Amino acid sequence: MILNIHGYGGSAQNSAYTALLSLGCDVTSPQLDYDAVCPEKVLETLREMAVTCHADTLIGTSFGGFFAALLCAELHLPTILVNPCLMPFDILPRLGNTQPIQPLMVLFSKLAAIDSSLVHCIIGAEDEVIGDHAFTKRLLCDADLVQVPNGRHSGATLPLQSYFQTILGK
């Protein structure tokens, strides 16, 4: 079972979800309201889902990548990050999120425990939201990281189906 976590303002039926379904994967993809629920509660909900549905792989896109990375550090599950927003306390206010950033900063510190050997990551070279992903590259130095020329922030601009197929062996 794959737990797919969408990004800020995104949909449970995002590009990652669509690509996974096309490969015949068993996917759980919750719709999350990041504006209405505090980050700690989002993480708690996702943790419970991962355990309850016996997730064996996590996939997170953008802000969902932040939560997938946190769960990877905690649960030690293989994780695929798609244009991850690993510093949401910096990015989300620029996107209109008005929640306090301190809870995100507390959660951010937990990324230090991530085992990058469990992580695969695909990023767009022309990501207009995150930028050059310099922090992602440094944090995940041992990860399998693919940078897509001309790829933007939207997962629709990335070859997700073939990328997932290679990693998941589908």
Give the label of every model feature segment.
Residues 58-59, 79:
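Conserved alpha/beta-hydrolase fold motif
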Residues 1-53:
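Active-site catalytic motif of lipid deacylating hydrolases and related acyltransferases
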Residues 7, 30-35, 77-91:
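Active-site nucleophile loop of the alpha/beta-hydrolase fold
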Residues 39-40, 151-161:
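Catalytic histidine-centered segment of alpha/beta-hydrolase-like enzymes
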Residues 140-156:
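Catalytic histidine neighborhood in serine/cysteine hydrolases
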Residues 121-127:
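Short beta-strand/loop motif that positions the catalytic acidic residue
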Residues 128-134, 155-156:
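Conserved alpha/beta-hydrolase "acid-adjacent" motif
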Residues 59-68:
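Gly/Ala-rich beta-loop-alpha elbow adjacent to hydrolase catalytic centers
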